[in-house]
């Protein structure tokens, strides 16, 4: 799903909620920079989901984590440089302004979905406590939960070279 299209690159997000994973392996203070999920997305997921040719078209993106969580005033940590990342709480509100637009169906591979048929999905933003992260629930609301919750899916975001998307095969 295209979030932004520019001359040089396009910002894409998974249309579906993919794998359900913990944001971090333990319930401890963590930011996007130090999260287990960030490490997994930029290593195992990148290698598993994309061919070498596709990986060469994915740009490194400077990910701004400076805002943290403006509602709970929790620190966002340092900015990062990632090939795969998650949207922040604020970016979710920008790209998906209404709760209905934030609803996300799971893939068949995803383990769980709510009775309404939609998945919870992580943001990269910290939650109400240093060991919480924000996620979007099955109703499209932004909520905080423990970083070691394993029943929340991911919607990876990548920035891809525009010429790669529009190439002739």
Predicted regions span which residues?
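Collagenous Gly-X-Y triple-helix signature in extracellular proteins
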Residues: 1-169
């Amino acid at each position: 799903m295209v979030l932004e299209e520019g001359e040089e690159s396009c910002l894409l997000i998974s249309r579906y909620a993919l794998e359900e994973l913990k944001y971090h392996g333990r319930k401890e203070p963590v930011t996007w920079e130090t999260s287990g999920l960030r490490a997994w997305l930029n290593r195992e997921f990148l290698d598993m989901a994309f061919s070498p040719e596709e990986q060469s078209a994915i740009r490194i993106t400077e990910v701004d984590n400076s805002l943290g969580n403006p509602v709970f005033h929790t620190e966002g940590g340092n900015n990062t440089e990632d090939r795969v990342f998650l949207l922040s709480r604020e970016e979710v509100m920008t790209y998906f302004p209404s709760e209905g637009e934030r609803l996300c169906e799971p893939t068949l591979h995803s383990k769980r979905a709510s009775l309404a048929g939609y998945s919870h999905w992580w943001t990269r933003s910290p939650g109400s406590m240093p060991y919480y992260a924000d996620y979007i629930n099955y109703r499209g609301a932004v909520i905080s939960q423990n970083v070691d919750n394993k029943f929340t899916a991911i919607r990876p975001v990548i920035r891809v070279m525009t010429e790669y998307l529009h190439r002739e095969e």
